[in-house]
């Protein structure tokens, strides 16, 4: 069946009194009606993949029946790749959970002579087990302890992670305790805890790959770079960020499937694990602002209005109509964005409110620590200081004293970057794709923030693959970013222990930042020249756009002139050819 026809359904008497319709096709056709030879075949259209495919027999044949394999579907192949690279990632951390004799007949972790740095196996999970008092079985945020400060004083400490990440650590500790009490092979409690955490993080990354493969649309094989990224080997188990990437990817997938409330819930959960999934709401709002026609919804379609409620029956009617009203509201771009934002905010509050109410001091610890934290070793501010001897915006500070000027500068730079991205989104000749703006926002956050922990680079991996599916370029950036781990570990080892000077480490940080800026530049270029966007070939608009996908791109007369979309090169050429006739942007 190549077309879909509608036919009148006759009654039993043979008449056709109404317009009851049925589909002649077995089901409603998919929106993608391209022929089978238009499928994504990387071994044929990507030189890097073609060269790598020689290991398994070479590129796919000209007469191969693509998409007919029963078991080894693209998704299962991606899962196999992911499991292999996650196993490699676990093996890189395995050296840090080796046990040795403690001299008293017991066992202890073998971190002697800086093993965690020499073997480059360091993971925050291992020291946090004791530092966050998880080894005592205490509930996070309720438990507190006293620590000595460098100036000779003391301070009260609590769990330093957002609520969902802290609860995940607590749940992993409880699972580890259950394992220890079962007749199963045993180990140090911290070793069992690390493996439980790693298992959950592996599931989170598998979910990230699954959701990203669905977001990729016809280019499902782009998600293979997420599965086989060098950053997975180095940082999948460095911290708990795979949880946040799973929520972020599934939130974007829910948005792509036109479920804004579910998208907001998932992004809100991600924000309760790490901050960055909430930042993805910004591009959604800006793109919906550009796409919304700003016309009032007819009252007849909206159902009963609040001002018409004058009885209990009217209240019941209004409540019955609420789901339909919400669905109708979500059909508008700004309506869908509003639902997503409200759902995200509500979810974040629901997750955080119980902890904030019961243990306010413990709940505030994450925000207190990030306020008083100084520039991270591989932030741009520390890079400048390492090469110039600069003392920073605030100069020397006492322990616990917040770097107020640094915090302000970092925030202002990020806001300025977001304003620039918003201007680009509104004035681009064609509405940008959602993942393009999402990558730009997260990259701007990392580049301007005072903290860029090494595992934060995992945030960029799915977004980069979906925004810029150029495999060689992405693989080069991922390799550079992963290799920053080597000088970092030997810098932490210290020069007295045959480590490297700080500038060796910060020099590689400069290369990483330049690589990320290069990706940003390429994405901006493709936003301004959408004809060069590989995703938008074969009449594809925005696979992750949801209500934005194939939506009209109006001229937005209600916006100031400097914020309206600019003419594309094709529009400008058409206007030069027909100077006396108005050019319709949507028909060019």
Residue locations for each model-derived region?
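Membrane-interface alpha helices of multi-pass inner-membrane proteins
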Residues: 231-235, 251-252, 261-287, 440-447
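TM-lumen/periplasm interface segments of multi-pass membrane proteins
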Residues: 2-211, 216
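C-terminal multi-pass transmembrane helix bundles with aromatic-rich, positive-inside signatures
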Residues: 22-57, 61, 66, 469-588
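Specific aromatic-rich, kink-prone transmembrane helix
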Residues: 244-260, 293
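Aromatic/glycine/proline-enriched transmembrane-helix motif characteristic
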Residues: 378-447, 527-588
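Perimembrane helix-loop-helix junctions
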Residues: 280-345
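Membrane-lumen/periplasm interface segments of specific transmembrane helices
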Residues: 318, 332-414
């Amino acid at each position: 069946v190549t077309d879909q026809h509608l036919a009148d359904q006759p009654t039993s008497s043979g008449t056709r009194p109404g317009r009851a319709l049925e589909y002649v096709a077995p089901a409603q056709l998919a929106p993608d009606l391209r022929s089978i030879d238009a499928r994504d075949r990387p071994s044929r259209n990507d030189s890097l993949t073609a060269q790598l495919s020689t290991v398994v027999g070479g590129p796919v044949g000209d007469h191969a029946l693509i998409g007919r394999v029963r078991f080894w579907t693209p998704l299962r192949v991606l899962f196999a790749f992911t499991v292999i690279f996650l196993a490699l990632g676990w093996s890189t951390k395995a050296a840090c959970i080796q046990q040795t004799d403690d001299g008293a007949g017991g066992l202890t972790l073998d971190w002697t002579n800086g093993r965690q740095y020499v073997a480059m196996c360091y993971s925050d999970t291992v020291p946090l087990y004791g530092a966050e008092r998880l080894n005592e079985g205490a509930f996070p945020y309720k438990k507190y302890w006293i620590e000595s400060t460098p100036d000779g004083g003391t301070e009260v400490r609590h769990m330093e992670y957002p609520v969902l990440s802290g609860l995940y650590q607590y749940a992993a500790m409880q699972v580890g305790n259950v394992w220890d009490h079962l007749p199963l092979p045993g180990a140090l409690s911290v070793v069992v805890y690390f493996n439980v955490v790693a298992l959950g993080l592996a599931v989170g990354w598998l979910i990230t790959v699954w959701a990203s493969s669905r977001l990729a649309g016809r280019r499902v094989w782009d998600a293979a770079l997420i599965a086989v990224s060098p950053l997975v080997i180095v940082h999948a188990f460095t911290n708990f960020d795979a949880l946040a990437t799973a929520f972020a990817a599934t939130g974007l997938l829910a948005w792509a499937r036109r479920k804004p409330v579910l998208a907001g819930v998932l992004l809100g959960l991600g924000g309760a694990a790490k901050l960055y999934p909430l930042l993805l709401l910004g591009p959604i709002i800006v793109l919906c602002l550009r796409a919304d026609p700003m016309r009032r919804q007819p009252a007849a379609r909206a159902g009963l209005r609040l001002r018409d409620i004058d009885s209990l029956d009217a209240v019941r009617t209004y409540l019955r109509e609420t789901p339909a009203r919400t669905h109708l509201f979500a059909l508008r771009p700004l309506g869908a964005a509003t639902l997503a934002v409200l759902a995200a905010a509500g979810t974040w509050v629901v997750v955080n409110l119980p902890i904030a109410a019961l243990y306010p001091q413990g709940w505030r610890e994450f925000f207190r620590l990030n306020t008083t934290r100084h520039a991270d070793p591989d932030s741009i501010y520390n890079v400048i200081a390492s090469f110039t001897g600069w003392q920073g915006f605030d100069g020397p500070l006492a322990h616990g004293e917040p770097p107020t000027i640094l915090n302000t500068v970092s925030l202002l730079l990020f806001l300025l970057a977001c304003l620039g991205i918003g201007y680009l989104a509104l004035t681009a000749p064609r509405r940008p794709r959602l993942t393009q703006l999402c990558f730009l926002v997260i990259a701007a956050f990392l580049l301007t923030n005072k903290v860029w922990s090494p595992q934060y680079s995992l945030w960029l991996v799915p977004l980069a693959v979906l925004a810029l599916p150029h495999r060689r370029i992405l693989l080069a950036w991922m390799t550079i970013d992963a290799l920053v781990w080597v000088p970092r570990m030997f810098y932490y080892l210290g020069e007295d222990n045959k480590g490297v000077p700080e500038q060796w480490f910060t020099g590689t940080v400069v290369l990483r930042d330049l690589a990320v800026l290069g990706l940003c530049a390429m994405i901006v270029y493709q936003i301004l020249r959408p004809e060069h966007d590989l995703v938008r070939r074969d009449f594809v608009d925005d696979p992750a756009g949801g209500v934005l996908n194939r939506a009209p791109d109006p001229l937005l007369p209600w916006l100031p002139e400097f914020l309206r979309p600019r003419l594309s090169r094709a529009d400008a050429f058409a206007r030069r050819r027909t100077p006396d006739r108005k050019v319709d942007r949507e028909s060019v």
